[in-house]
């Protein structure tokens, strides 16, 4: 079975480093819950678009390089691959982040079969690649996936908890995600 997985806030846990860099840059502590109230940083802490751009220009690469993987992510993906899953990373990250991203994935031994960069419409990408499931966090991507009929596992963050659909489930633990996908794979074989 083919599955798709996002990187930021799904494989890569940017929360701790993001919190520290926001404090360093803006001189004020914001909780992770506050930072993730909205998908865009500027909407969560009420800064201008220009301030947000400057923040990401200064710290974006560092956050992408130095953040740790989500707990149990590597083990869960390895287990899924051992059980016949084909793992495709689908990310909105531009190609100019390819070197950093590839290096981070290798450093943390994240198992996957294919990676696709610069994807704006993840639902369409999943349909084109015949991928029935995707693990995602961004609400706009989740909506696009659901519109295309792609079953979606959402890593729960305040910015996506309002979404509800028969093809959507919120799961916060990679071990539970792996278990759920294995159950779905067995269901697909029986159908």
Where are the model-predicted features located?
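Short, acidic loop-to-helix structural element flanking the phosphoryl-transfer center
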Residues: 61-89, 95-101
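Conserved Lys-Pro-Asp/Glu-containing loop-to-beta segment of HAD-superfamily phosphomonoesterases
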Residues: 122-145
């Amino acid at each position: 079975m083919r599955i798709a997985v996002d990187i930021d806030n799904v494989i890569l846990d940017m929360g701790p480093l993001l919190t520290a860099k926001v404090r360093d840059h803006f001189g004020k502590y914001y909780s992770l819950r506050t930072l993730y109230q909205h998908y865009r940083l500027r909407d969560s802490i009420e800064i201008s678009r220009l301030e947000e751009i400057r923040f990401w220009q200064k710290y974006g690469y560092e956050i992408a390089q130095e953040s740790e993987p989500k707990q149990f992510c590597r083990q869960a993906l390895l287990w899924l691959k051992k059980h016949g899953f084909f793992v495709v990373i689908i990310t909105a990250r531009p190609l100019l982040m390819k070197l950093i991203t590839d290096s981070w994935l290798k450093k943390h031994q994240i198992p996957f079969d294919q990676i696709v960069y610069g994807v704006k419409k993840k639902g369409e990408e999943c349909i084109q690649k015949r991928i029935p499931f995707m693990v995602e966090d961004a609400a706009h991507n989740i909506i696009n996936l659901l519109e295309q009929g792609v079953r979606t596992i959402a890593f729960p963050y305040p910015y996506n908890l309002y979404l509800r659909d028969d093809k959507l489930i919120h799961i916060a633990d990679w071990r539970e995600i792996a278990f759920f996908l294995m159950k779905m794979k067995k269901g697909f074989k029986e159908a």
